[in-house]
Structure formats: structure tokens, C-alpha cells
């Protein structure tokens, strides 16, 4: 099993990510022997201590019986990092993990067990959205965690995994913004598996940042489906049921106001395309 972690200037987050991985329950074959685990940190375009943080986990990985591979890639590109890490990955089960995400203790074991077998499969855990610090992001979270895409599908943002037959669905990662959506839509809804354990996922902080991230997300989705129209057949993003939106607005009026304002502002022309951490 290979865990692939693209990381761009993630010194503040990577330590917690790797620590959470190392706290995972044992992943075992049916005979009780440990499954070989390889962790590939693909540092790309880093000007901070990301690589040093990763190297600091070498002895702990060794004690666990895991293999740590650190790639120091000059160019800052998540897609380039994913492809470079894939080229070094040795596991049939591939987990793609963002460096600012913390896995639950049973998520690796559940992932391994769910992805056994010859048929193409995709799996992800439940998304536990960390409560933000700022008012706007907290209000936005109240609605975002309850939208149908979160409650009735398997989003996979931040953590997704495929088995060998599933990974054969595509060759290299194309140069797209929505890499997680690109992979999810390689599978129809009957090929995706929702795991019971969760991963902690961070929402971006601040109204302007929410707008930037939402705009980037929407642009990435449009571009992806325009370039790969065959993937539209596997899109199962549900809409609100009748009355559901109204009930949410009555229960969380401030949250709904912020959520709608972000959606509206994200449709306006962007002044710049500055990158913002987090997703919405």
C-alpha cells in the first residue's frame, strides 16, 4: 500500500499529517502479517522546511516497518508531484492524501480491506470539517457540511484511494485543477465505497479566501468536464430536495447568507488568481 502526499510549503501541516498516519491501526493480511506500507512525500517547489519535517519522521516510519520516500521536486506543481510520486509508488492500493489532512485511526485499515479484489474500486472516508477560527468561515461551514454533495455522495477531497484495477482507469494525471474530481469521475457511483472512519479537513479562513477557493473550484470543474466530457456520465452530484434549502435557511440564517454570498461573489470576474489554502 502506498500513501502519496503532494506537499508545497507544508512545514506547518505535514508533521500533524504524518503523525496521524503513524497512529493508524495495524494494516494486516488475512494471515496476520503486516501489509507493507510506503509513504511518498512529494515536496514540490518548497521554499520552507517541508523536506526537513518529512525527514524527521524517518526513524518513526522505520520502527513501524514502513518505508518513507521523500521527493524534492524543484517545480511547484501538484500534478507534477502526483505523477512523480506515482512513478515511485510500489503499492497496488494507492492512497492520495493532502498534506494538511489528518486521517482517523482506522482509515488506512478500512481502505486496505475495501479495495481488495479484482474489480476497479474507489474509496474515501467521511469528511470531518474542522471548525474554523473566523466568523465567516464558521458560518459557511454550517451549510457546506450539510449540502447534498457532502451528505449523499463520496466527495473524496483531501483523501481518496484506488486499487490496482482502479488506477488502471487513467494513465498520468492531466494538468487540471480538480485532480480529486478527475479521479472520482473515473468511477460510477456503484464503484465508489464510503468508509466509516473519517479524516480531518480544513476549510479556508476568511470571506475573500472562501470566494477565491470557490471560484477556483468551479473553474476547475468546468475545465475538467470540458476537456473530458466522457466523465460527465459518472457525475452524480445531487441537488437539494424540495424544502431542504428552506429548512437549512431557517435553521442557519447567517450561515445561509454567507454561503449564498460566497456563491454569488465567486461568479464575478476575479481581480487576481491568487491561490488560497483550503477548499469550499
Where in this protein do the model-derived segments appear?
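Glycine-rich, basic loop-to-helix element that forms the pyrophosphate-binding segment
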Residues: 71-89
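Acidic helix N-cap motif at the loop->helix transition within catalytic regions
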Residues: 13-15, 48-57
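Terminal low-complexity segments of carbohydrate-biosynthetic enzymes
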Residues: 203-204, 212-280
